[in-house]
């Protein structure tokens, strides 16, 4: 395995009843890169992620993770986390009625010599985690006190503190405004600089070109291709996702849109 590669998926195949969800799909993620996983609805993106995170058991292929000896054929979600694979979804999977510190350390709380939770240590460590990521928040406050964007960043901070090597962000910007998206991108670039490999799933093409280094395109459960961001113009990306001829899409794009004047009637309703 290349020293610069943190994750390799080879020949991943999976079938649902009557549907070939994934057909011999390859995917490679490098250390310290943001890699977009693109495709229309039903292309196989979610299924591939679920195979990677241990939710789905795939029928053929293998996964290799940096630092783990030998291939991973199938593993559980817990196994995936232990290998350094973490996912943050658009719907934050944390506990809103618990404090930020409790959410950061849930299931792995520091203990005193008596076996009780060491609250002081947990708060201190939690505050350092968020401070190191330039998140201006009070970890003693309940999670629900913060915006969805900050909640997602807290979920990312938890993953990072659990020594994640591969961070999957599945439609993280769907409910965020432009300012919140910029904050998320800043955090993503900080993690990139630390060597974390990030898989970014989104339908917003402008965001892909704003923050990603490479793009992998899936269509109908198959790999279309893997491209450096600078070598794949948007219209070619759309063509790859849709399975359309590039020249046809370019011709459509070049056609002039009709120009309407004040005298043109667009809608006319009478006697309603």
Predicted regions located by residue number:
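Glycine-rich phosphate-binding loops of nucleotide-dependent enzymes
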Residues: 2-272
């Amino acid at each position: 395995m290349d020293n610069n590669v943190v994750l390799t998926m080879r020949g991943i195949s999976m079938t649902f009843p009557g549907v070939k969800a994934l057909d011999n799909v390859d995917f490679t993620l490098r250390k310290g890169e943001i890699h977009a996983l693109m495709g229309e609805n039903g292309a196989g993106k979610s299924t591939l992620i679920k195979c990677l995170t241990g939710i789905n058991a795939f029928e053929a292929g293998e996964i290799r993770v940096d630092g783990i000896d030998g291939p991973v054929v199938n593993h559980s979600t817990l196994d995936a986390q232990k290998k350094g694979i973490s996912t943050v979804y658009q719907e934050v999977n944390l506990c809103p009625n618990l404090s930020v510190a409790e959410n950061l350390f849930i299931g792995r709380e520091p203990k005193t010599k008596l076996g009780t939770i060491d609250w002081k240590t947990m708060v201190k460590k939690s505050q350092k985690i968020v401070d190191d990521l330039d998140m201006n928040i009070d970890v003693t406050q309940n999670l629900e006190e913060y915006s969805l964007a900050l909640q997602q960043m807290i979920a990312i901070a938890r993953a990072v503190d659990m020594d994640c090597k591969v961070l999957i962000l599945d439609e993280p910007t769907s409910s965020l405004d432009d300012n919140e998206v910029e904050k998320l991108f800043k955090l993503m670039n900080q993690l990139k600089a630390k060597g974390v490999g990030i898989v970014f799933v989104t339908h917003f093409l402008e965001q892909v070109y704003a923050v990603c280094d490479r793009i992998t395109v899936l269509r109908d459960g198959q790999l279309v291709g893997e491209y450096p961001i600078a070598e794949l113009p948007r219209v070619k990306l759309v063509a790859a996702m849709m399975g359309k001829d590039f020249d046809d899409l370019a011709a459509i794009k070049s056609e002039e849109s009709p120009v309407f004047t004040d005298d043109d009637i667009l809608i006319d309703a009478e006697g309603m």
